[in-house]
Amino acid sequence: MKKLKAEMWDKVQYIFRNYYDGMIHCAIVYRGKVDETLLRRAIKLVVDKVDVLHSSFVAHPIDPYWRVNDDYTEEEMLDVVYGDVSHEKIEELLVRHVDYRGKLQFKATLVKESGDKSVLCFVINHICCDGRDFIRLTSRI
C-alpha cells in the first residue's frame, strides 16, 4: 500500500472539517458539444498523475497519512446528466461534499443540454489543492 505523508495543513483542515466548508466549488460553462468519453479520459490522465486526488485521508491519531487508491475507474470520475442547465441544478451539484475517506477527493458532473451548452460542476477537497492549483488542474483537463 502506497502512503503519502499528511502535511500540517491537511491535519488542520481535517480537525476543522465540521466547522467550515473545506471544498472548492466550480462550474465551467462550455458552448458547444462536450464529448463525455474524452472528458472522462482527460480527467483520468490528470488524476493518475496526482496521487492525492485518488487517495483517502487516514486520520491516525499520531501520524495521519493519505492512502493511495489504485482501484478507481474512469466511470467513477465523471457523472453525466442530461437535461436543462438551471441555476438550481448547478447549485445542487456544487453544494455537495467530498468525503475525505473516499476513494477520490473530487466529484465531477457534466450537465448536457439538448442544445449546445454543457456545464461541468466540479467539487474538490481543499486539502488536495488551493485555488491556484485548482486553476492549473482544470486547465489541463
Q: Where do the language-model regions lie?
A:
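N-terminal beta-alpha "docking/capping" segments at the starts of catalytic domains
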Residues: 1-36, 41
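Acyl-thioester-dependent condensation/acyltransferase catalytic cores
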Residues: 40-139
